[in-house]
């Protein structure tokens, strides 16, 4: 299986990348991002790309893949709806539309979040935007599309959040997260489990 991974330097993406590289059933991983992953592995190829609204310059390198893990994401904290929509909806749909055209047999996996509002009418801005993103992804002509809605994700194996305040929470709550994972598995996952 050949995988494309967006967001390989974020916390969830780091976990997905690690698990993909360890999985004998995965032949290759193409990480598309603004910055390098900092990893070397025979299965790993990287494309550094700045314009997530236009893939025309790299389209030929995005064809021939079986699955995509789309792990790009930002917190909505302190963000207005227009900016959050651009970063969450517009960028995701630009990539997904391109990939669906180039790889019609692709499986697309989108990491979203628990509490996402599929009705697109709720009071929480982030949940509405995520809901619209999910709904429109499901309309694209992929072989299949899956929406992963984790609540809290415990980073393992030295994986860290790029967002300082989020990382501080994970450090402070580390022992509690392990306990929560055992007593409330519906609300807790790990970076291992968020991957294939």
Residue locations for each model-derived region?
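Oxidoreductase cofactor-interface core, primarily capturing Rossmann-like NAD(P)-dependent enzymes
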Residues: 22-27, 42, 118-196
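Structured catalytic cores of enzymes that bind and process phosphorylated ligands/cofactors
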Residues: 18, 23, 65, 94-100, ...
């Amino acid at each position: 299986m050949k995988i494309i991974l967006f967001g390989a330097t974020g916390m969830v993406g780091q976990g997905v990348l690690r698990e993909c590289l360890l999985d004998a059933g995965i032949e290759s991983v193409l990480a598309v991002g603004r910055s390098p992953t900092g990893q070397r592995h025979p299965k790993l190829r990287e494309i550094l790309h700045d314009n997530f609204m236009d893939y025309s310059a790299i389209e030929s390198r995005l064809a021939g893949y079986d699955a995509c893990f789309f792990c790009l994401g930002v917190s909505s904290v302190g963000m207005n709806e227009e900016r959050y929509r651009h970063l969450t909806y517009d960028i995701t749909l630009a990539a997904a539309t391109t990939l669906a055209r180039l790889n019609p047999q692709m499986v697309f996996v989108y990491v979203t979040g628990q509490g996402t509002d599929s009705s697109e009418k709720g009071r929480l801005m982030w949940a509405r935007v995520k809901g619209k993103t999910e709904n429109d992804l499901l309309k694209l002509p992929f072989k299949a599309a899956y929406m992963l809605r984790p609540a809290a994700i415990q980073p393992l194996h030295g994986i860290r959040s790029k967002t300082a305040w989020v990382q501080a929470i994970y450090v402070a709550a580390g022992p509690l997260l392990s306990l929560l994972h055992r007593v409330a598995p519906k609300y807790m996952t790990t970076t291992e489990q968020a991957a294939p």
